[in-house]
């Protein structure tokens, strides 16, 4: 009994020992594929589905991971190693597996204005040689930049063109033209960047041009006018000068629910102004009044002769109770009325 | 919806003053509350402050009408009165024309008023003066423009036009779908 138990204990201890220190050799039906550059191993063996689905799943996975890691480490030990600061380091080869990139592929740069134009026109870049032969110095020189061939900045004499002003400084003119070209190029570069980033292009303003058009001149005038410390508030105006067009003034409306009392006051003031604009003496009204008086005068005269009354078509209105007889009934009679009518028709 | 600009206010007041003269003041300055004019879809609406505040809850494209429509601005920025304004203008009318019962119908069909249909007319009416048209029973029927002065009315023949038609309450039926 006792001996049996001792043997058992020894066997168990042996088994435990073997469990703890597993062999570095792992047997697999199919060999693993390795990519030591990425410390990667592919296991193509079938999984034991019965183990995997059962309650021993965790153990199964752990042992699988242990075996495969062991194989990967075996593979790493096959690589050349060296000793760096008491540590053994393996030199990994280049990875063979292609991994997808971490970030999305960069978008192509948006074309500049010139590139758009060149594409439209089918203009293609021509490769030019870097060096050109300089006749003057009898040597090969760069085509552009410092110490270039045919350097027009180094000329000691410039011929005055026949059409140019003889007193003009041709050197200064050339310098100025160059500076403007540089400025313009820089401006275009910034505009290209702004366009590429879909930012609003900053206020274009005015660019130097050889010949300003009428519209450009008008723009220059309006820009110059508001370019004062007071934003053009006290700028004098020419007689009959028209206000600049497209100055960007927007329509502004009062708020929908604002100050009702001030709105009312404004309308009442407007009414007052409209009232005061009316002429004091309304000529047509005055003439009509005169005509009416004459009418009633003659009617009264006629009444003496004819006592007949025709009330139909009478116009009492604001009748003043003058005892005026019906106008319509009398109309055909009065010969004396004709001149009045003419007066009325004036 | 927005308040009228100064220009628009002036145009509208000039048109209204043809009918009610300086009585516009009574429309603006009312003792019974704050009333205002607002523009919406080119139409001028007259409403109280209370109604206006309620109307702000309705989105612009869904709002068909609010308060009383006084008229509309044409594309050339002229103001045209609508018949809906009649109730507000009738009490303040300065010049009136009464139509005989026989030609009431003709006027309500949109025709001008002939001399034969003229019942009464306010004394002193000028030519081209804006007038309000009433039936003989003093029911307001619409607006018009005097084609003749009161004096001339006496002399013209019965078929002559005395008042030009502008708007009448028949429009409530005739142009039911456009009135707001």
Swiss-Prot record, chain B:
InterPro entries: NIP7_N, Nip7_N_euk, PUA, PUA-like_sf, PUA_sf, Ribosomal_synth_fac_NIP7, UPF0113_PUA
Domain PUA as annotated: residue spans: 94-170
Family label: Belongs to the NIP7 family.
Stretches the record annotates as N-terminal domain: 1-92
GO molecular function: RNA binding
Protein name from the UniProt record: 60S ribosome subunit biogenesis protein NIP7 homolog
One Gene Ontology term, aspect cellular component: preribosome, large subunit precursor
Keyword tags: Nucleus, Ribosome biogenesis, RNA-binding
Gene: nip7
Gene source species: Danio rerio
Subunit structure: Monomer. Interacts with pre-ribosome complex. May bind to RNA. Interacts with NOL8. Interacts with FTSJ3.
Function: Required for proper 34S pre-rRNA processing and 60S ribosome subunit assembly.
A biological process from GO: ribosomal large subunit biogenesis
Region (C-terminal domain): 93-180
